[in-house]
Amino acid sequence: MVLSPTDKSNVKATWAKIGNHGAEYGAEALERMFMNFPSTKTYFPHFDLGHDSAQVKGHGKKVADALTKAVGHMDNLLDALSDLSDLHAHKLRVDPANFKLLSHCLLVTLALHLPAEFTPSVHASLDKFLASVSTVLTSKYR
């Protein structure tokens, strides 16, 4: 999926507003995913998945850091996320459908925390961006 200049601008502007809340929002999105899509818990059998879990917060930071990297490399997501794609496809063997679920939960989380910024245009741009990231993360499954 090709991101237009407007999409890229919307994503960068929104990500800048997230500021130092990335880890917090990442953890909140994961917690939301675990509550609403319980099958996703199977990939974290060693985690305490309770509210305010340090392990979920730590993984939320990893998610946020990966997305921050992706925001900085929107023109070359394939190279920027190649290692993560390998990890999820070959070592962790995450069901590719879970990326869409997490993307949805991230969008909900961002809409809740940034209601003024979450216009229909920004929503569409973030959705396209997260779909592009998901496509890259599942590219090594084939």
Swiss-Prot record:
The modification N6-succinyllysine is found at K8, K12, K17, K41. The modification Phosphotyrosine is found at Y25. The modification Phosphoserine is found at S4, S103, S125, S132, S139. GO terms for molecular function: haptoglobin binding; heme binding; metal ion binding; organic acid binding; oxygen binding; oxygen carrier activity; peroxidase activity. O2 binds at H59. Residues 2-142 form the Globin domain. The modification Phosphothreonine is found at T109, T135, T138. GO terms for biological process: hydrogen peroxide catabolic process. Heterotetramer of two alpha chains and two beta chains. This is Hemoglobin subunit alpha. The gene is HBA.
